[in-house]
Amino acid sequence: MKTTLAAAAAAVVALSACASKMSAPAPMMFSQASLPAAVQVPAGNKVVLETVGVGQITYECRAKANATGEFEWVFAGPDAKLMDRAGKQVGKYYGPPATWESMDGSKLTATQLAVAPGGTGNIPLQLVKANPAMGAGAMQGVTFIQRVATKGGVAPAMPCAAGNVGAKQIVNYQADYIFYKAS
């Protein structure tokens, strides 16, 4: 019995030593392979930050441009927290103008290059080209931002008509914002 227990204990120690030397698999970097070509970031750029934006989008009821007597819900601006994959807030996204700001105070705006359908009930996927960052920090050198994995955020279903011009509606949304810098 003592021999069996000693052998079992030795096996546990040996296996524990092996296990402690094994490292956890490296976290997967975001892959854009499954995204529509229109919103893929050009070669020569690499992912430097992956965030999950959780927040709200405000829409305002306005008269349609060049369509007398017609009205529509118009995107008025986002307000979201940017969280890292572990759930820690690393920044915020707000506007207008659309602004991504790191907790270190650096921030940037961007110019939309393309959109692609995000699925029924979801705002579109988006690719933007970053303008030069303001302030030193994480946003310095960012070249592109992708909005992917969108959930919600579409204009409200309630009617927008002459009687409620100027009314605002807030809808919840979530999206991943992937930040790139030149390789």
Identify the residue ranges that each predicted region occupies:
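C-terminal motif of bacterial Sec signal peptides marking the signal peptidase cleavage site
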Residues: A14-A17
